[in-house]
């Protein structure tokens, strides 16, 4: 076996970089939702695990501790859903050639 062609290796590196840019764009497009307290708190996050929206039922605003607990539960629910959808999308983008969990970890989005 001969040495790998340097030109081919550089092309593969460039293609991997382009795939990562595609992954970043796809993650921004993913929107996941979470709610808690029977819908009293609703949130949405994107695939890059950024909070997009937060809705709190005004009727519960006088109970700060409950609101805090519900916000945390809703955000965590949405983040879990976003991570699941992100992994599914990454499998599509990479054609199964790369481990989605490793990609998310490299993007500082994995656990």
Curated annotation (Swiss-Prot):
Keyword Signal recorded:
no
GO cellular component, as recorded: bacterial nucleoid; cytosol
Q: Name one Pfam family in it.
A: YbaB_DNA_bd
Listed InterPro entries:
YbaB-like_sf (IPR036894), YbaB/EbfC (IPR004401)
Which keywords annotate this record? Cytoplasm, DNA-binding
Source species, domain of life: Bacteria
Q: Where in the cell is it found?
A: Cytoplasm, Nucleoid
Q: Which cysteines are joined by disulfide bonds?
A: none
- Any GO MF annotation of the entry: DNA binding
Q: Where are the transmembrane segments?
A: none
Q: State how it assembles.
A: Homodimer.
Cross-referenced HAMAP family: DNA_YbaB_EbfC (MF_00274)
PANTHER family linked to this entry: NUCLEOID-ASSOCIATED PROTEIN YBAB
The family assignment reads: Belongs to the YbaB/EbfC family.
State the protein's purpose.
Answer: Binds to DNA and alters its conformation. May be involved in regulation of gene expression, nucleoid organization and DNA protection.
Q: What is this protein called?
A: Nucleoid-associated protein Cpha266_1171
According to its UniProt entry, this protein's organism is Chlorobium phaeobacteroides (strain DSM 266 / SMG 266 / 2430)
